[in-house]
Amino acid sequence: MPRSFLVKTHSSHRVPNYRRLETQREINGACSACGGLVVPLLPRDKEAPSVPGDLPQPWDRSSAVACISLPLLPRIEEALGASGLDALEVSEVDPRASRAAIVPLKDSLNHLNLPPLLVLPTRWSPTLGPDRHGAPEKLLGAERMPRAPGGFECFHCHKPYHTLAGLARHRQLHCHLQVGRVFTCKYCDKEYTSLGALKMHIRTHTLPCTCKICGKAFSRPWLLQGHVRTHTGEKPYACSHCSRAFADRSNLRAHLQTHSDAKKYRCRRCTKTFSRMSLLARHEESGCCPGP
């Protein structure tokens, strides 16, 4: 047999196995490019995973260090130091984030040309009074309504209000001067400037809350709850001054005015005063000053 058949020839068209070349390199040798010392990433007894889908295990600080050419560090620091950057910091990263061994370089934020941070506008409290320091002239809202001397003022009709809730209720229900879309009720001719206010008004026509005992309908669930208590006899709201109890909280508040010393309603014919408007009306209907 000719000797040429026994000699192994290397083909220039064959792709070399870089994984085998990587594992067969010298453990402690010099880099052919820069002459620096090459330190292995893993010890000799721990080989790299052979399956492409497997990820390398986390590093062991006692046995593994970053594979980096030592003479290159002074050159990198010298090149970056000329640009005004601070000293570099080498930190470990999770090897699962990337297959290759990466050494991130982190510099100081003082030398980066980053845009300034966005400053969000401050939302002022609507309870700021005109006598408090730093009170804004305008509030953050749909139209940034200015502060009136007595509180809040409507932009369109210039009607003042003491609270922001009162102004919002006025703009939704009563103010027809503001420019914008108007929502009209399909059951009556009332108009509203917000869809939410219109939906609350439509409930007065549809009456979706119905009593299962008598069939009476209500527009609000709490009105139905107070009505059901008239069937069950439940009266959870008791007066702290007497032994009376009520099924609804509003009736209790009206009753508490009878215990108050301040009588706000006065009869125009006599000097008698009453704590509630209904009591005054009953007094006038009965005839407080009968004729001779």
UniProtKB/Swiss-Prot annotation:
UniProt GO BP: regulation of DNA-templated transcription
PROSITE patterns assigned: ZINC_FINGER_C2H2_1, ZINC_FINGER_C2H2_2
Region feature (SNAG domain): 1-20
Protein name: Zinc finger protein SNAI3
Coarse class of the protein's main subcellular location: nucleus
A Pfam short name: zf-C2H2
Protein family membership: Belongs to the snail C2H2-type zinc-finger protein family.
Organism, as annotated: Homo sapiens
SUPFAM superfamilies noted in UniProt: beta-beta-alpha zinc fingers
Single GO molecular function: DNA-binding transcription repressor activity, RNA polymerase II-specific
Subcellular location: Nucleus
Zn-finger (C2H2-type) residues: 152-174, 183-205, 209-231, 237-259, 265-287
Gene3D superfamilies: Classic Zinc Finger
Keyword Methyltransferase: no
Function: Seems to inhibit myoblast differentiation. Transcriptional repressor of E-box-dependent transactivation of downstream myogenic bHLHs genes. Binds preferentially to the canonical E-box sequences 5'-CAGGTG-3' and 5'-CACCTG-3'.
A GO CC term attached to the entry: transcription regulator complex
Keyword terms, alphabetized: DNA-binding, Metal-binding, Nucleus, Repeat, Repressor, Transcription, Transcription regulation, Zinc, Zinc-finger
Free-text note on domains in this protein's UniProt record: Binds E-box via C2H2-type zinc finger domain.
The keyword Phosphoprotein appears for this protein: no
